[in-house]
């Protein structure tokens, strides 16, 4: 059975605004930001146009920014929390930005590796992709068990890159998205994916 999947990145937080590595830090959305609220409204209209404004099953990463975004986009809909869809663990780089890390040799080594080295005291990309794909399978298997043809997940930029790069056998950074953007596609299991399209406000 084909499954229509929507993956969306959460809305903007203070850490995003300051270009910080925000993984396990549990930040709220910037709800007083008029531009963010305008984008949420525009994204809701886009989802209606795509016919995915009321997905049959709604999954979320457990952190506040994802749960708040899901409530704004799909008000009142039950949220199924998938712990394995948490953002990457940035380890020692957590909550810091480029300016604060630029003098750190470990950060320069990570940059030079194209992000392939593990974050000091954090995750490496391979482990993160493996964990995230376990979360993706958890979602799709639950949907098929419950005969759902359409699911949405409000997750992280890293989660989207991990899932799409794995399914498409493509470059990890090819699927970077800003806040409140993501991808929709049809999934048939066993890595079969089609009709991939980018979704943004």
Give the label of every model feature segment:
Residues 5-6, 56, 147-157:
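Generic beta-sheet signal
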Residues 73-131:
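Phosphate-handling substructures
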Residues 171-195:
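Domain-level recognition of soluble alpha/beta enzyme cores
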Residues 2-3, 8-77:
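Active-site-proximal alpha-helix that buttresses catalytic centers in soluble enzyme cores
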Residues 13, 159-160:
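Short active-site segment of divalent metal-dependent hydrolases/proteases
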Residues 47-54, 139-150:
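Glycine-rich phosphate-binding loop signature in dinucleotide/nucleotide-binding domains
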Residues 196-201:
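Short, solvent-exposed aromatic-acidic interface loops
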Residues 60-61, 130, 154-155:
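Short beta-strand scaffold positions
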């Amino acid at each position: 059975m084909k499954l229509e999947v929507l993956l969306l990145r959460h809305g903007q937080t203070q850490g995003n605004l300051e270009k910080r590595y925000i993984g396990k830090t549990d930040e709220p959305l910037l709800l007083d930001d008029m531009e963010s609220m305008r984008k949420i409204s525009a994204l809701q209209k886009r989802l209606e146009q795509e016919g995915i404004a009321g997905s049959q099953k709604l999954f979320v990463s457990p952190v506040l920014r994802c749960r708040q975004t899901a409530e704004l986009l799909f008000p009142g809909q039950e949220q199924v929390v998938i712990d394995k869809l948490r953002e990457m663990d940035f380890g020692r780089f957590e909550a810091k930005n480029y300016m604060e890390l630029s003098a750190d040799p470990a950060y320069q080594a990570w940059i030079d590796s194209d992000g392939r080295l593990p974050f000091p005291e954090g995750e490496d990309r391979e482990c993160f992709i493996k964990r995230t794909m376990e979360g993706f399978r958890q979602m799709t298997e639950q949907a098929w068990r419950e005969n759902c043809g359409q699911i949405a997940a409000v997750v992280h930029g890293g989660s989207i890159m991990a899932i799409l790069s794995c399914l498409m056998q493509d470059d990890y950074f090819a699927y970077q998205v800003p806040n409140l953007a993501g991808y929709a596609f049809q999934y048939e299991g066993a890595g079969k994916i089609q009709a991939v399209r980018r979704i943004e406000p």
